[in-house]
Amino acid sequence: MTAMEGASGSSFGIDTILSGAGSGSPGMMNGDFRSLGEARTTDFRSQATPSPCSEIDTVGTAPSSPISVTLEPPEPHLVTDGPQHHHHLHHSQQPPPPSAVPAQSLQPSPQQQPPPQPQSAAQQLGSAAAAPRTSTSSFLIKDILGDSKPLAACAPYSTSVSSPHHTPKQESNAAHESFRPKLEQEDGKTKLDKREDPQSDIKCHGTKEEGDREITSSRESPPVRAKKPRKARTAFSDHQLNQLERSFERQKYLSVQDRMDLAAALNLTDTQVKTWYQNRRTKWKRQTAVGLELLAEAGNYSALQRMFPSPYFYHPSLLGSMDSTTAAAAAAAMYSSMYRTPPAPHPQLQRPLVPRVLIHGLGPGGQPALNPLSNPIPGTPHPR
């Protein structure tokens, strides 16, 4: 190293190179070290070892350069336009993810190191100028989350170097790509569901219409129940009706033997005679109740006595102090007691209001005796 410095008359250390670049040397700023000789170029390559934190991968940007070189971005007026510069920009629009490569992994061995190839200043400046721009643009959110085709095109260049800084981005891309098929599957399922929904709506609509038809049909035609066939009404002849009426006037209730005899005499069945008597008694009780009310309201107890020849009755003089409602209730009680029907209890008839008077207990001249046993009339024998 010392011999080379003595031969050339200048030092090529990092400090010397940077100080020379700051002083405005055109050869140093343009990066053209070929005029200084092969020894200087070798010294520069030996001292310009790649940094582990270098974010510029020359495998993706400049395939002809075997090592990565960190350079300051040149001034815009120093960059010359050329076809090669456009060629580099075209291939490095979207650089691969940043990676930190160890120095010993990228530094070529003396046996495997290819001979240095001369590069023009435009190519070096183009690669140096394009590197910072593309390296900063790859960290945008839209570039990380978006599905950009230039990144996919540069994937073969970036896969040649593995780095721990490169793993999260690959995982995020893989997660993003694995998330997209899930979204597509869910979209496909929703589309299938939407396609199936009209069919299900049609099915539901069809079942609803069928249910409505069944309801309307059930309303229009109610279910036929198994009813017993109604018996035909018996048409009695005049002779049969006259004989039944005469028997009813004599006897309101028939015994089993009397009913069978009457049915045989009239050429009827026992059931027909029994049914006729039940209907006739119902009609008779209704007519009698109405008649008793009318008689009680009118006070005509002589007609009541003629209608119901009973040994016990309520005398008009005893019932004269009661109102019409009480008299009608008393008459109905007498009527029910005559024909063996259970009397309906009246609130005013819970206790006996008037005593029962014997017909033969009347005094001479038709004057009633309230208590013929305790107050005998003179001239009448005392009953013993």
Curated annotation (Swiss-Prot):
GO terms for cellular component: nucleus. InterPro entries: HD, HD_metazoa, Homeobox_CS, Homeobox_TF, Homeodomain-like_sf. It holds the Pfam family Homeodomain. Disulfide bonds: none annotated. Keywords: Developmental protein, DNA-binding, Homeobox, Nucleus, Transcription, Transcription regulation. It comes from the Eukaryota. It is found in: Nucleus. The keyword Nucleus applies. Its main location: nucleus. One of its GO terms (molecular function) is sequence-specific double-stranded DNA binding. Potential regulator of neural basic helix-loop-helix genes. It may down-regulate expression of ASCL1 and, within the thalamus, up-regulate NGN2, thereby regulating distinct patterns of neuronal differentiation. Belongs to the BAR homeobox family. This is BarH-like 2 homeobox protein. It comes from Mus musculus. The gene is Barhl2.
